[in-house]
Structure formats: structure tokens, C-alpha cells
């Protein structure tokens, strides 16, 4: 057996594969000096308190000064967070992050007056400010975003009470997280050789991918039998969460918790319902995929613990990082040379922290900002790793374009559009790979890779969204969220989504208890809408060429300058209709048909 590759210390990683934090601050001492300097922004804010409605010049002067402050504070945060993530065990950078957090709390408190004061300026007066000071036009979007919440903003005294209550609002999620991640323990299981295997939240999916059905079944039962024994506790967490959301929605004069959550990012409630309806209308594609999985696994009975097992062996070789970059550049060529030039700049100028090292934060992410985005990877030289590079650089270039083309107040895009650029890159990559292979096995592997991603992102997240809607409606009717009600509904949804081709094991009724996303307040549906929008955009780019690419770049450059629905319309996608979701689901169905032919 080959020896396991040793994970290097941070100091042992080749510099060219580390991100250039020196572009933010050349030394830690300069960061410390900048933090001291940033403390002046707190008295600066206090000097403007009570004066924002005084004159056009005062309002403009404050907004400009706040932009400058936010840029400098953003650099401070970027450096401290990136350095901490390089080695999470490094006490020096953990202390630096602690200093940053203390400063951010004080800074946020100092600026708490801004929203109420801007809302308090009457419309005629603000219109007059705009005419007197044309430079305020730059802040029109920011001001309108704040002022559109006027109907949901309370009196000063009531807002103080809401702020105090807000300190408790995270408690259900935090208690649930501590229970799931720190307190709960699952019985060990054993493999065919009698070796003990530990079941944890982290090891669960790898165990579900195990080739031995007995290992999968044992892990499945270990996980869900344990959650079943605590189901009344976990139901109480969610019941408390829903009561918190209902309190906030009613206090702010919303008709429902769904409306309150979506109004914050200017997404119409109908978008949520359209997604669920479109998935329901196309559920036969998922049923067909389940039946294909059953056939390819060669089993008489497919179970819920069989859904993660690979059904096509990995036909691809190892893909080293340097080779992966070249493939990605070719795959994204339809986006034009200007896009590729920025991508190459990111590859060459150390925007990316590539390889795993001792203590490095796990996973992958992109962080936008000045002077350029930063991307964290834990590269493994696999197909999955190549898709991760394409995905995270999609985020990075979205941030790059937004910051380049928008003033600071409009540069940040909302979550509803955040996954579009990253997923668009993934779709272009899989299409390129499929167009450049004649090997049936490799083609089947690539298609299955995409289908699994699609199933997990569109179908699964929509099922979660539907369950979340059920919980909110039940709670809003005045009914407590009991464990039995949650288990019954969750089991019913699994039966509907997966169909008759699978045995829906009774244990799956407990799965809701291990899903942290149900504390995220109508968040997960955006994964499904973002994936669907990306599929539609990638298809336009590949079929319509330059016109579609030009539209897509308008989307990338729009930042937060409009509401998210309008921004997606720039790229030719209207998420107020079911069309983009239907188009994506049609693609899923077509790929299943091709998969069947390849595996016949």
C-alpha cells in the first residue's frame, strides 16, 4: 500500500502556489498601523450623527467618507481573514482576527444611526438634495434600497427593542449547530474486515459513497437512528427558529416570513413558488434518473443509502493543477479574450492559494475586494478539483468586474445572483470536456458528474425549499412544529421527489434534523435558481455567441446597481417566469437519455 502523502507545513508550500497577501499589506506591522488609523472612522461617524438630513452637502460628504472608510476596513478584514485561513492554528493571526472583530463591532454600532436617519428624510426634501447636488446620483440606488424599507422600519424606541431582541434571534441556530457538530455522537460501524469506522457529520457522505452496501446501510442507520432518539429536541430548535422569524416578520409588518426574507434582497415571492412548481412539473426526470441508477447498480431494490455510490467508475486520469488551468482557459474561450486575460492575471499573479497545508481552512471559496479577489483551494488534482477552480474563479471574475465597473456603494452583488457566474463556468467546462472526448466511458463519467451536481443543487435544494415553506406555514397557522409532523412531511417529500424506483427507507424521515440550512431563513432556494439561470446563460453563450457574451458581461459588471431580477435580465434570463428552470430541467432529462445510451 502506498504511503499517504504528507501534508506540508505552511512554511513548506512553494510561494507561487500561495496567495499574495502582501498586495493588501506588505507586513503585519503595516496592518496594525492601518487598524489604529481606522479607529478614526468611529468619531467621524459620530460627528455626522443627527445631521444626515441637514443638507445635500452633508449627506454627500458623509456617504463619500463612508465609502472611503469601507474600502480601508475591507482591506483590513481581507488581510486578517486570509492570514487566519492559511493556518487556523496560528495563534498570532487568530489574535489579529480577534482584534478585527472587536473593531468591526464598535464600528457597526457607531454607524447604526444611518438607516433610520436616511429613512427619516422626506421624499420632497431628498428630491431637492438630488437637484442641488448632482453628485448624489451615484448614491441613488443605495438611498432607494434603504428607503424602500421605510414601511418596515419602526420608531426609534421600537427599533431599540428589535435590536435587543435580535441578540437572541441567532440562538436556535447556534444551539442546533452546537448540538449537531459538538454534542451528538453516532455509534461506530464495521467494515467487512471488522475494522471500526467512525460515523461523523464529516465522514457520513464518504461512507455513503463506499462500495460495500453493508457499510452504507450501517452508516445510514447509525446516523438516523441517533437523530431519531433526539428528534423532539431538534424539532424544538426549529420551532424556536420559526417563532423568531414570525416575530420579526410580524413586527416589521410583513404578511409572511417568506415575504420578509425575500423582500430584503428584492426577490418577488413568486420566484420561490415558480421554482417549486417547475420542479414538480418535471419530476419525471428525477424518477428516470433513479431508475437508471438502479439499473446501473444492478440491484433488485435501490435504497436511500445507495444514492451517493458512484455508478460510473472514474475514467479520467489525474489532472495536475497546471494542466487544469490550461483546460479551463480553453473551456472558457467562448467568453472572449478579455475575460481570459483577467483569468490569466489571476492565475499568474497569485490570486489563488492552491494546495492544502497543515491547519489550512478546508473547502474552497472566493473573496472579492480591493486590490483583487482572493481564492482559497485545497487542490487534489482530480476532476472535481478542476471544476472547483472553474467555479471559484467564476466568483472571482464576477467580483472583479463588479468592483471595476461600479462605485463602491454598488459594487457588491446579492446572494440571489452570486452562484450564477461560478456555475456558468462549470457548465461551459463540462460542455467543453464532452465536446472533446470520444471515449464512451469518460463521456458517461462526465455526464454523471454533472447530473449528480444538478440533482444535489436543483432537485434536492428545491425539496429543502418546499420543506422550509411547509414549516413556515405550519408555524404561521399557530401550530407547533412537532417531530412527528416534521418527519411525516419530510418522508412524504422524499416519496414524491424520488418516485417508485427506490425504497424510501423510514430512516430518511429523520434527515431534516441534520440539515443546517433550515436555520438559514429561505436561503437554499437560491442555489437552485442560480444553477438554473447559469444553465440558461451558458446555453445562450454557446448558441448565440457574441451577443450573449456581451449581455453576460453587462451582468458581471452590474454588481448591485439594480435589483437582482433586473440584473439577470441583462444576461437574457427572466427569473420571474418558470422558463429558465424548465430549460435547465429539460437539459437534465436530455443528459439522462444520453447516459442511458452510453451505458446500454
Protein language model features and the residues they cover:
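Post-HEXXH active-site segment of zinc metalloproteases
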Residues: 388, 399-423
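A well-structured
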Residues: 1-314, 325, 600
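C-terminal, non-catalytic "cap/extension" segments appended to globular domains
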Residues: 11-15, 22, 26, 114, ...
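Post-HExxH zinc-binding segment in Zn-dependent metallohydrolases
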Residues: 413-442, 450-452, 456, 530
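Conserved helix-loop functional segments at active or binding sites
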Residues: 330-341, 367, 395, 399-407, ...
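Short pre-active-site segment immediately N-terminal to the catalytic Zn-binding motif
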Residues: 319, 370-390
Amino acid at each position: 500500500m502506498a504511503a499517504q502523502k504528507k501534508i506540508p507545513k505552511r512554511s513548506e508550500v512553494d510561494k507561487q502556489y500561495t496567495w499574495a497577501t502582501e498586495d493588501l499589506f506588505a507586513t503585519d506591522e503595516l496592518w496594525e498601523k492601518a487598524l489604529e488609523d481606522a479607529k478614526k472612522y468611529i468619531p467621524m461617524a459620530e460627528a455626522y450623527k443627527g445631521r444626515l438630513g441637514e443638507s445635500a452637502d452633508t449627506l454627500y460628504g458623509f456617504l463619500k467618507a463612508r465609502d472611503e472608510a469601507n474600502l480601508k476596513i475591507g482591506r483590513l478584514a481581507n488581510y486578517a481573514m486570509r492570514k487566519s485561513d492559511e493556518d487556523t492554528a496560528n495563534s498570532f493571526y487568530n489574535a489579529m482576527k480577534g482584534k478585527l472583530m472587536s473593531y468591526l463591532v464598535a464600528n457597526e454600532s457607531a454607524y447604526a444611526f444611518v438607516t433610520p436617519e436616511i429613512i427619516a428624510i422626506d421624499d420632497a426634501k431628498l428630491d431637492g438634495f438630488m437637484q442641488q447636488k448632482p453628485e448624489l446620483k451615484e448614491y441613488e440606488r443605495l438611498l432607494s434600497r434603504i428607503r424602500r424599507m421605510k414601511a418596515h422600519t419602526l420608531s426609534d424606541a421600537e427599533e431599540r427593542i428589535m435590536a435587543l431582541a435580535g441578540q437572541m434571534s441567532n440562538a436556535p441556530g447556534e444551539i442546533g449547530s452546537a448540538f449537531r457538530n459538538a454534542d451528538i455522537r453516532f455509534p461506530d460501524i464495521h467494515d467487512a474486515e471488522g475494522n471500526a469506522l467512525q460515523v461523523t457529520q464529516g465522514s457520513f457522505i464518504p461512507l455513503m459513497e463506499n462500495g460495500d452496501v453493508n457499510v452504507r446501510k450501517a452508516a445510514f442507520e447509525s446516523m438516523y437512528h441517533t437523530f431519531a432518539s433526539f428528534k423532539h429536541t431538534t424539532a424544538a430548535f426549529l420551532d424556536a427558529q420559526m417563532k423568531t422569524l414570525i416575530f420579526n416578520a410580524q413586527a416589521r409588518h410583513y404578511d409572511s416570513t417568506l415575504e420578509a426574507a425575500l423582500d430584503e434582497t428584492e426577490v418577488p415571492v413568486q420566484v420561490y413558488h415558480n421554482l417549486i412548481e417547475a420542479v414538480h412539473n418535471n419530476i419525471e426526470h428525477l424518477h428516470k434518473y433513479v431508475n437508471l441508477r438502479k439499473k446501473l447498480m444492478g440491484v433488485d431494490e435501490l435504497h436511500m443509502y445507495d444514492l451517493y455510490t458512484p455508478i460510473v467508475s472514474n475514467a479520467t486520469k489525474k489532472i495536475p493543477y497546471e494542466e487544469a488551468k490550461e483546460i479551463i482557459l480553453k473551456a472558457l474561450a467562448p467568453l472572449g479574450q478579455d475575460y481570459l486575460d483577467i483569468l490569466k492575471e489571476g492565475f499568474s499573479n497569485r490570486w489563488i492559494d492552491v494546495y492544502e497545508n497543515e491547519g489550512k481552512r478546508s473547502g474552497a471559496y472566493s473573496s472579492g475586494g480591493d486590490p483583487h479577489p482572493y481564492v482559497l483551494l485545497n487542490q487534489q488534482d482530480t476532476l472535481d478539483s478542476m471544476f472547483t477552480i472553474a467555479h471559484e474563479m467564476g466568483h472571482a471574475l464576477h467580483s472583479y468586474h463588479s468592483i471595476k465597473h461600479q462605485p463602491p456603494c454598488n459594487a457588491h452583488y446579492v446572494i440571489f445572483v452570486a452562484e450564477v457566474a461560478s456555475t456558468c463556468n462549470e457548465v461551459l467546462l463540462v460542455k467543453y470536456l464532452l465536446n472533446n472526448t470520444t471515449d464512451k466511458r469518460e463521456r458517461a463519467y462526465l455526464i454523471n458528474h454533472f447530473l449528480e451536481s444538478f440533482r444535489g443543487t436543483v432537485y434536492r435544494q428545491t425539496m429543502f425549499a418546499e420543506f422550509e415553506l411547509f414549516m413556515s406555514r405550519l408555524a404561521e397557522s399557530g401550530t407547533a412544529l412537532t417531530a412527528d409532523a416534521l418527519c411525516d412531511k419530510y418522508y412524504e417529500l422524499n416519496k414524491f421527489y424520488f418516485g417508485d424506483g427506490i425504497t424510501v427507507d423510514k430512516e430518511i424521515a429523520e434527515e431534516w434534523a441534520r440539515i443546517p440550512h433550515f436555520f438559514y431563513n429561505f436561503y437554499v432556494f437560491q442555489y437552485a435558481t442560480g444553477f438554473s439561470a447559469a444553465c440558461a446563460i451558458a446555453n445562450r453563450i454557446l448558441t448565440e455567441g457574441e451577443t450573449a457574451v456581451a449581455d453576460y458581461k453587462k451582468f458581471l459588471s452590474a454588481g448591485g446597481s439594480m435589483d437582482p431580477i433586473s440584473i439577470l435580465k441583462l444576461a437574457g434570463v427572466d427569473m420571474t417566469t418558470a422558463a429558465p428552470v424548465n430549460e435547465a430541467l429539460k437539459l437534465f432529462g436530455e443528459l439522462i437519455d444520453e447516459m442511458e445510451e452510453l451505458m446500454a
